[in-house]
Amino acid sequence: MKKGYPRFFLLPGLLLLIAIIIFPLLFTIRVTFSSWNVSQSGLNFIGGENWGEMVRDTRYWGSLLRLFYLSFLTVAIQYVLGFAIALFAWKGIAARRFYRVLWLVPMMTTPSLMAIIWRSIFTEDIGALNGLLTRVGLSPVNWLTESGPANIAITIVEVWQWTPFMFLILLAGLLSLPKEPFMAAAIDGASAWTTFARVTFPMMAPISIGAIMIRLIDASKIFDSVFTMTRGGPGNATETPAAYIFQRSLQDFQIAYGSTLALMYLILAILTLTIIGKVFARLSKPRGI
């Protein structure tokens, strides 16, 4: 009895896990095999019709490919900029604490509010960005109504909001590095670039991998900026899986089909991120990490 007593304290957490994760997941799986929508509230079994429709849904698969490209591009830019800013702050610039707080402001802004602000900046007719382009003699750009510029606008917003996260994690990692390797590099006469490439960057690899993985997980759910700024348009040029699932489930009221899309989205996200994590782990081994 005494040996099993500590396990009793796991029961509240286990019940909470069942209530908020396992039961909704099992219920969602059941819903995918039904015809549940706004006109049919019952869970009538229809076999794999929803899954077959999903396989033929080119719009859904296109949104997945778009998300894959968008998430990797934005996270890569965030990492490079975040690392550069972290190195800048790490070197002991004046008013480091002030700049540290200032750089965190975008991340602390509510995503929907941030997207509204950026939408006003990118607006073609009265937006501040086109006004600036006109002042310097350049032609205005249709940021939100053309495919290419719209994707660039979404990328800018995502980078602006989440680069501070990379900065925060990487700066914490830099501040935790031991000083001895840098002292040894200085004694050997290593240049600043050599010290970074041979000492700083390899020692930061585990922290970098962790930060990138966290951001990839979060970037796989891009929704606020897309839905607020472009509604997935023009056409479907900026539509992500989350935006498409939202439309099919809560605007078209096709609950069962939306659940099917969401479940496949979850499966693919888990598989992709697991593979990426294993690749990162394998790449880090030759460096002795």
Regions found by a protein language model. Give the residues of each.
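A structural signal for multi-pass alpha-helical bundles of membrane permease subunits
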Residues: K2-I289
